[in-house]
A protein has these predicted regions:
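Mid-domain Rossmann-like dinucleotide-binding core that forms the NAD(H)/NADP(H) cofactor-binding site
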Residues: 128-199
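C-terminal substrate-binding/catalytic core of Rossmann-like NAD(P)-dependent dehydrogenases/reductases
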Residues: 255-303
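A glycine-/small-residue-rich N-terminal strand-loop-strand element
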Residues: 54, 72-95
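NAD(P)H dinucleotide-binding glycine-rich loop of Rossmann-like/cofactor-binding domains
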Residues: 93-154
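Glycine-rich cofactor phosphate-binding loops and adjacent beta1-alpha1 units
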Residues: 194-264
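C-terminal capping/lid region of NAD(P)-dependent oxidoreductase domains
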Residues: 2-4, 293-303, 311-333
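N-terminal glycine-rich beta->alpha transition that marks the start or flank
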Residues: 3-6, 18-21, 26-72, 84
């Protein structure tokens, strides 16, 4: 990195609101401390969490904060104790409390950086950190027991599409809710059956398909209320995994199916993970990226927009004007 480069362009947050309220400003590049790297971003991946926190005014955000959790780029600087060489391509998932990926340069903890193998494009790598690691964490909540049935909701989405494929690797029968437009693709991947989430009778259809069996686990990506409605479908000693929201109270009476409840909060790693947790994080990320490299993991189709168009692109994601596609933002520095 040229020592004369000390500032960069960044989209900044100033008050709770819509993505269009972000401002494009010049910001100083934060020099890396011990264990940190500066990434020259080449690609930003937009995620629902981005527009949610922009609207919510998170604790610690001040006017001028740079949002964005997922990015891909080149290591331009490294602090003491970092083993990643300069020039290495990495993907990362930034903590919400730190200056994020909506910038030409981002300073991140090396712990959260995933080295991208040759043969994986920036576009594909950008689809891994938030969706892929969330799917991995969700699956890790549930014991790997053979010959089980599980449900994944919203399987047309980035997280659920990856999660469904990881669940299939456990030799589970995987059922999914999704829009009919995704049905053929999901069945081709090996999904046992899909149900239109807009059909009020889909739960009865699932019960009929299961016959005498019950679900071992249900993975929900919708919201807490929706997850609560899935609880009666899960059998004895089963698992309900909430990827979006969490359940504050048990959804079923005590001493019935002994349902286990699980919360998934990927970004909480930045405040609570140990060194061993981060090692597992990077190992999981490496496995996901390698699966992409060898063609063993399908990702959402993507569209690529320009850095100057980031706010309207994020707004399109928020308001459902673009569905079933990952929105990526390319940065030309």
């Amino acid at each position: 990195m040229d020592a004369s480069v000390t500032t960069c362009r960044a989209w900044t947050w100033h008050a709770p609101g819509e993505p269009e309220q972000l401002r494009l400003e010049d910001q100083g590049i934060v020099s890396p401390g011990p264990g940190e790297i500066v990434v020259r971003n080449t690609m930003i991946a937009l995620n629902p969490v981005d527009w949610k926190v922009i609207a919510a005014s998170p604790d610690g955000w001040r006017p001028g904060h740079v949002p964005g959790v997922d990015g891909v780029g080149i290591v331009a600087q490294a602090g003491d104790g970092v083993g990643i060489p300069l020039g290495t391509r990495v993907a990362y998932h930034q903590g919400l409390g730190k200056a994020g990926s909506f910038a030409e340069y981002t300073t991140v903890d090396a712990d959260c950086a995933l080295v991208i193998p040759d043969g994986v494009s920036d576009e594909s790598a950008a689809g891994i950190p938030c969706p892929g690691l969330t799917a991995w964490q969700a699956l890790a909540k549930v014991p790997d027991m053979p010959n089980r049935d599980v449900l994944v909701t919203g399987a047309g989405g980035a997280v659920s599409l990856i999660l469904a494929q990881l669940a299939l690797r456990r030799n589970w029968r995987v059922w999914a809710t999704a829009s009919p437009v995704h049905r053929e693709r999901l069945l081709a991947l090996g999904i046992a059956g899909t149900f239109d989430y807009r059909d009020e009778g889909w739960r009865a259809q699932l019960v009929a398909a299961l016959g005498s069996r019950r679900l071992f686990a249900a993975f929900d990506t919708t919201n807490g209320a929706y997850a609560r409605g899935l609880a009666p479908l899960v059998g004895y000693n089963g698992h309900l995994v909430c990827i979006q929201d969490r359940l504050e109270s048990p959804p079923l009476p005590p001493f019935t199916t002994a349902l286990s409840l699980h919360e998934v909060a990927l970004n909480s790693a930045h405040g609570h993970a140990t060194a061993e947790d981060w090692r597992e994080w990077r190992q999981a990320g490496a496995h996901l990226l390698d699966a992409v490299r060898v063609g063993a993991l399908d990702l959402q189709p993507h569209i690529v927009t320009a850095f100057d168009d980031l706010p309207p692109s994020l707004s399109a994601l928020k308001h459902g004007r673009i569905k079933g596609q990952k929105i990526l933002v390319r940065i030309e520095v």
